[in-house]
Amino acid sequence: RGRLALPHDGYFEEDPVRLLEMFQLADLHGLEIHPLAMRAAQRDARLIDRAVQRNPRANGLFLDVLCSPRDPETVLRWMNESTVFGRFIPDFRRVVAQMQFDMYHHYTVDEHSIRAIGLLAEIESGELKEDHPLSTVIMRQIVSRRVLFVATLLHDIAKGRGGDHSVLGEEIAKNLCPRLGLNPAETETV
């Protein structure tokens, strides 16, 4: 019925990488996730340890969702609501529900970052062509989508830590980008 369900309750315990795979499959096939599967993901997100974080397949699945040409915003939001996102990217967990108090930001840092990915995807798809014609043209000329999407996700990752969040964010990017599978040139660009 258009919703992704789990075959049995211990599904994630057998292979915690499946936590990422569930979201990637939902994105790939345009499916919603059954509420029981979301509850299981939230319960089992604790299974995401350093081994899962460093797992190349898990990182590839995450990058697939982040750079999806479909609806990355919705799927990233589901990942965030289930706590899988913050468990997989611990630096993101630090900005969940963090308020920003200035005239440019109307959302918490996590929601702002997820929404930024959504806007990028909408510009790329042409949905915002009338409102953002120049951005739509420029988007077609981007050399590396994944660099742009990763950079967009990480642009405020170090907010609230004291000091210049762009400098602190650079250190996070230097560690996270190779883990996600970006090469040295892509990492430097981010």
Functional labels for PLM-detected ranges:
Residues 124-135:
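Helix-hairpin-helix/helix-loop-helix acidic hairpins
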Residues 30-33, 124, 184:
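Long, hydrophobic, amphipathic alpha-helical segments used as structural scaffolds
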